[in-house]
Amino acid sequence: MTNNKDKKVLNVPNLRFPEFTEEWKKVRVSNLLDFYPTNSLSWEQLDYSNGQIKNLHYGLIHKGLPTMVDASSDLLPYIKEEIVPKSYTLFKEGDVSFADASEDTNDVAKAIEILNCNGQQIVSGLHTIHGRDNTDQTVIGYKGYAFASESFHKQIRRIAQGTKVFSVSVRNFDETYIGVPSKDEQAKIAKLLIAIDKRIATQNKIIEKLQSLIKGLNDSLYKQYGNAITTSFSDLGHSYSGLSGKSSEDFGSGKPFITYLNVYSNNVVNENEYQYVRINDGEKQNIVQCGDVLFTLSSETPEEVGVGSVYLGIDEVFLNSFCFGFHIDNKELAYPPYFSYYVSSTPFRKFIYPFAQGSTRFNLCKADFEKASIKLPSLNNQKHIYAILNSITGKIETEKNLLEYYTTQKQYLLRQMFI
């Protein structure tokens, strides 16, 4: 790679392959692409199991699809047969589709490019803009990354309209440009970024398989060893509440506290995700201790009530008011780190589900939950199971770090290899 960052040369990226030296063209997007009508079909009008014509919904652009969409393998829903539009424009190889709206200016005009669509009937759907390069200035695979580049999205952030939801329209592309090098250079850029995307996809699959392994092994080991001890949470220790008496002015600085999302999202509390709250001298608030089991108290769905996490840190931290903590006093029956896996096991989730009460919002009946009988492996087996599962968790963290590296590498190239 050649670094042009400090060279006073117009219309070349900061980073490029060394065999290319000529300047890039800056092309107005509205001159590069022709635009075609899209439909406004909602999710209720789509079906993943049956149909003839597939539909690209903007929600899939925002979450679920890669920059390069392989029409032969990436999953897209069909339009229900009874509501297929009378007129539509099918995607061709290399067509792009932009999401025209988002709550985040960074995601407005997020784009995908369609590959391998021969024999596939796919149309662009709700809140999308369908574009095609009929000028033959670009190669297949280049446009999707050019429209994902920082230089393009910097322009979009400037012109996106809205307050809570930001949007763009076809006429906004009169104001935006992308850099277009020779087709040979385009092809080489696309090949590199496609290779990185494929490696990211592989890395995600590795992580998913390890997560599936740990879930299955957790349930299997509990089934094999989980009937050794009959007890209850109230026999194992005592519970305590989260923060109380706080107003919005108290948050933002001060002492660290564990958020609801931290408890909900992690089997073990993530110590890099603390937020902060002012705790006055002499103020009485419960402090979370190492080994405490934390639970969510309420949610809009019963499945999300009583989701647990274990704190294994040593810092003085507090707990948000929408969760409660449980301190294990009886260390002869329970090994606190094991509970980071126990509370996420299928048997435990089935056990806690009936204690979620409510209609529109569900709350955990804490008193009944603590008194209810639970079964645990022996103390030695709890330690043994924890060691096995924690070794896989360590492997998952290693793979996640590698995924972050590849993702960061891709974002760096999207910033440096385009104008």
Model regions and ranges:
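Short, ligand-facing micro-motifs at secondary-structure edges
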Residues: H62-P77, V96-G125, G141-Y145, K154-R157, ...
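Sequence-specific dsDNA recognition surfaces
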Residues: S30-L46, L60-V96, S234-S247, L261-V293
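Amphipathic alpha-helical segments with low aromatic content
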Residues: M1-K25, E175-T176, P181-N227, N380-I419
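A short glycine-rich beta-alpha junction/loop motif
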Residues: D6-P13, Q121-I129, T138, E150-H153, ...
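Structural detector for helix-capping/boundary residues
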Residues: L15, V27-S30, G59, E150, ...
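Non-catalytic DNA-recognition/assembly elements of restriction-modification systems
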Residues: V12-S40, L221-S244, K371
